[in-house]
């Protein structure tokens, strides 16, 4: 089978909303409705629970977690409308060691639930989005102790579900209950909407940029049960960007799609309310039109439970998938064409 369950870890007493992986030391962070944030090390075929962060810091569910690139900082966004920043006390981890994460900062500003957070690739900017229909961009220094809001983006008409930065270009994408994805760009230190992607017929829960530098592409998952691939056409210096829907991926889901992830090797994974984990690959042909096919599906990937998120990770030199669901479990998957 192309998809095989490698491990299933029962980590939380309630649904797991978010996961993020720090590849250098193999650190996995999880956020849950039970308000706990857990940090594990996945290395040498073993999993070691390093720390359970103070579950009294957030008063409601932890909806999103994100490691700062090339850093020891972890950010967590909560339904209590705040974002917490954590730092590691011991950066030299030995096998079997424990790790103490210390609270470094609490960021306040949103008027309602924080749904998504994402660090820019250089780690200088943190984007957050909320049920209050806004996207905030925060600037910080190397220490990550202080955060200044440099822009509040309020062009979405409904709840903003997700934000993600491009890994190579200075672009931010936000996905919303208003059925759109908006692309944001920095114009002389002023963040503005460069494009609005329309076409989905329902809430857009998630999006992810491709890891290639050119062309610039984005995949999105929606309430309408589809995954779409969008492509930027034009010059990176254009003020108003033109994006086209390059492809609607073959139908692998029958319900809402809550998570999408684009791998460094070019595969797209999706998960959702129907409990299906799907992987798609792009057909290799001479056509200018992007064509995709389903490479693998796994039904009931979290038994009868909904799946909230999916990530591609590299563990011990091997590309794998991680999913998290309403069952409080985090599942690790082997994938092979």
UniProtKB/Swiss-Prot annotation:
GO cellular component terms given for this protein: cytosolic [4Fe-4S] assembly targeting complex; nucleus
Residue stretches of each WD repeat: 11-50, 57-96, 109-148, 155-194, 199-240, 252-290, 301-337
InterPro entries for this protein: CIAO1/Cia1 (IPR028608), G-protein_beta_WD-40_rep (IPR020472), WD40/YVTN_repeat-like_dom_sf (IPR015943), WD40_repeat_dom_sf (IPR036322), WD40_rpt (IPR001680)
Keyword Protease included in the entry's annotation: no
Intrachain S-S bonds: none
Taxonomic superkingdom: Eukaryota
Subcellular location: Cytoplasm; Nucleus
Pfam families: WD40
Function description: Essential component of the cytosolic iron-sulfur (Fe/S) protein assembly machinery. Required for the maturation of extramitochondrial Fe/S proteins.
Family the UniProt entry places it in: Belongs to the WD repeat CIA1 family.
Complexes and interactors: Interacts with NAR1.
The name this protein goes by in its record: Probable cytosolic iron-sulfur protein assembly protein 1
Natural source organism: Candida glabrata (strain ATCC 2001 / BCRC 20586 / JCM 3761 / NBRC 0622 / NRRL Y-65 / CBS 138) (Yeast)
Protein's gene: CIA1
